[in-house]
Amino acid sequence: MLIFGAVLMAGAGIAFASTRNLWLLLLAGTIGVISPSGHEVGPFLSIEQAALSDVVTDRTRTEVFAWYTLAGSLATALGALAGGTLTHALRATSMTPVPSYRMVVMLYAVLGVLLAFLFARLSPAAEASILRSQSNALATLQHEERSRTNNTKRKPFFLYLRALRDFVSRRRAGTASRRKGAFRATLAGLSGIDRSRPVVFKLSGLFALDAFGGGFVIQSFAAYWFYLRFGVNPGTLGAIFFWANIFAGLSALLASRLAARFGLIKTMVATHLPSNILLILVPLMPTLSLAVLVLLVRFSISQMDVPTRQSYIMAVVRPEERSAAAGITGVARTIGATISPLFVGFMFTRPALINVPFFIAGTLKILYDLLLYREFITVRPPEEVRE
């Protein structure tokens, strides 16, 4: 699946470099999972997260996700710098903007091919661990079944009474209960989660709210805002977001240390909440230098919740449900993030409204932080319970 995703990425890059048809571009962007935020989105992220969780211990999981986030942020930073610098250099040679951008997306396609090659050389240990989780779950069920069989042999009269009681209870429950049970079983089969479903669905709703707010200020929109407000050129924009992503990546390592001391939820909220206050302050800055400074300070703490969030999802669900949980929460975030750009496009066409996306994003994300703390401060991952 990861190789397939890389091939789709390469195909999308080729499509963007070779056609101007809007519908084909929309199709390529959707199937190729092109992210306007500069960060990975789509169904393949859940596979990576589940595989990582299965090959590390609970105690080291958050630290591993921190390094995972750091690697992604460094790559995003280099991409922002390379994209801005390359575009600026090509335009300096009298190349018009559109052809210069096409050269950049062709490089994106080449990287997709390289990624497919690297995935092909990936160790099978991750998939083996997922299979072990499924085997362990099956072994547990078989053990429980054998225990029930042994108890039936040893205590026939007691189990006869219990069976009679269960039969009467089922009769009283009636058709409605049977339909409800069938519906729950069907839902579990479709979603891939059973016991973790309440937690996963509640987290998904909160993550969708956070992503909806974040969709107002994704990096491409923030870059365009700097262009509209201060007339910043592509090369300078590339440098700004290079350093922003560098700071974001380095902060992930600090997040793992804070989580080890204070807990995942407290770390998520304590770092994310101040960053959203800074987000609201960005458009209030009177000069480019101050706006960039506030943005960089925000990036230095805003991504601390990413490795802790990923680790928390993997911690509070059963091992065999991790891929499904990561997929469901990831889809929720993707759906939330796809709605807000519709409003941003409208606001950016009106000079009086170009600052509003920052205010909306900051407010919604602060609301997410408060709700997350209220709902999950008592739901602790295994490594925190054992301490």
Model region roles, listed by residue range:
Residues T76-P99, Y224, L228-R229, I339-F359:
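Transmembrane alpha-helix termini and helix-breaking/packing motifs in multi-pass membrane transporters
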Residues S220-T236:
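Short amphipathic helix-loop junctions that connect adjacent transmembrane helices
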Residues A125-A211, L228:
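Juxtamembrane intracellular "pre-TM" segments in multi-pass secondary transporters
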Residues M1-A15, K266-L281, G362:
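Structural signature of the two symmetry-related core transmembrane helices
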Residues F44, V56-Y68, P234-G235, P319-T329:
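Loop-to-transmembrane helix entry/capping segments in MFS-fold secondary transporters
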Residues M9-G13, R20-P43, A51, L290-M304:
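Hydrophobic core of transmembrane alpha-helices in multi-pass small-molecule transporters
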Residues T87, S251-L264, F348-T349:
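Helix-to-loop junctions at the C-terminal end of transmembrane segments
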Residues A109-I130, Y368-F376:
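C-terminal membrane-cytosol helix-exit motif in multi-pass small-molecule transporters
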